[in-house]
């Protein structure tokens, strides 16, 4: 929303983003499931010989990188791309990076497309994927017990990042809230309400979060943490009460942290610490 305010309109915002493809020499890599980006590539003024290379989390077509069952494949940079594909890595390989989410798969496919466009050997790409690790507090699995996963995405300090987290799991106990800095959560809550098995609301601007949940997720159990101290102790305890086997307790606050924590890392560390302490007591 702030980007749109800055640029004045969606069209101006889109035009600015599209400049990344201008004068491309080798390959315009784009998500085939994003029609706006595909249009940017179609309209881009590129150098002769530059190719449009799509990536997807699904089955790749010709000139695309994607997944055939559990294998990351290249169907763009080989001679017989009409009838065959090059294996790059498996989904099991990608689990070494972090929690296997749709956007992790998409990022791996995009990185593969970029690397292959410059002739990097498939074996070298696989080796790089096996070595790569996400930074802490980015959809990081903290613990798993009794069929319940506890995931730290404290780095999700805005609705866009929180949406990527919520989109990664089917049933979520959502730890949300903090310093909203004027951001409206109504669209986010409305879009992902059907994935919520519960919500734990923290932060100094809880009222706005509670109102969005009441409006768009009326049947979702909500617990407000109003205690000024030991916020994560009470939050994790509340999540334990709500969570059932198959649920993911997800810290993806969609807000900044400095109202109750030093920073997002402190928030994530306190979450992880309380999860481990309280799960040991079971």
Model feature map: region roles:
Residues 114-123, 127-137, 141-282:
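ATP-dependent carboxylate-amine ligase
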Residues 1-149:
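Acidic, Mg2+-coordinating active-site environments of NTP-dependent enzymes
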């Amino acid at each position: 929303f702030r980007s749109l305010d800055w640029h004045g309109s969606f069209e101006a915002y889109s035009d600015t983003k599209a400049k990344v493809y201008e004068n491309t020499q080798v390959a315009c890599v784009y998500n085939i499931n994003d029609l706006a980006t595909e249009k940017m590539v179609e309209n881009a003024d590129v150098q002769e010989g530059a190719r449009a290379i799509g990536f997807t989390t699904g089955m790749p077509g010709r000139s695309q990188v994607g997944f055939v069952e559990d294998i990351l494949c290249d169907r763009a940079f080989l001679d017989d791309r009409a009838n065959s594909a090059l294996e790059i890595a498996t989904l099991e390989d990608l689990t070494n990076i972090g929690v296997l989410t749709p956007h992790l798969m998409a990022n791996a496919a995009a990185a593969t497309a970029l690397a292959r466009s410059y002739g990097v050997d498939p074996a070298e790409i696989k080796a790089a994927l096996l070595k790569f690790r996400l930074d802490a507090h980015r959809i990081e699995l903290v613990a798993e017990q009794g069929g319940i996963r506890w995931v730290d995405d404290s780095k999700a300090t805005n609705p866009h990042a929180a949406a990527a987290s919520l989109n990664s799991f089917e049933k979520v106990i959502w730890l949300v809230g903090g310093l909203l800095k004027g951001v409206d959560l109504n669209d986010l809550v409305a879009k992902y309400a059907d994935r919520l098995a519960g919500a734990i609301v923290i932060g100094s601007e809880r009222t706005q979060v509670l109102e969005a949940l009441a409006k768009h997720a009326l049947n979702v159990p909500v617990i407000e943490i109003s205690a000024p101290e030991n916020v994560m102790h009470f939050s994790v305890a509340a999540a334990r009460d709500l969570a059932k086997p198959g649920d993911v307790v997800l810290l993806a606050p969609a807000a900044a942290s400095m109202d109750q924590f030093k920073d997002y890392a402190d928030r994530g560390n306190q979450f992880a610490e309380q999860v481990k302490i309280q799960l040991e007591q079971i």
